[in-house]
Amino acid sequence: MGDITGEAIVLRNASVLAAEIGGELVLMSVSQWHYFGLNSVASDIWERLASPMRVEALCESLATDYDGDIQVIRKDVMELLSKLASRELIEVEA
């Protein structure tokens, strides 16, 4: 898998199971059988990926909603998306 860019389209992998456990959203990859816990901001990102979304639009909407620095948000989002993609929890379309 190559680097995820701002122009890439990302969305949830439809086969991933999600459940709230102890106030944390936990994802399970059926294909790889691992669990992945998400904090509140990562859970918000997961909710937004219910529909396909361009990475840069995701970063911009988070910067607006959280009143944060777009550069910091972009870095953090790219890191999270890379982790999710490497575990087959999201799909990435170049």
Locate the predicted segments by residue.
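Long, low-complexity, charged/polar intrinsically disordered regions in eukaryotic proteins
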Residues: 1-29
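Long, charge-rich, low-complexity alpha-helical segments
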Residues: 21, 34-94
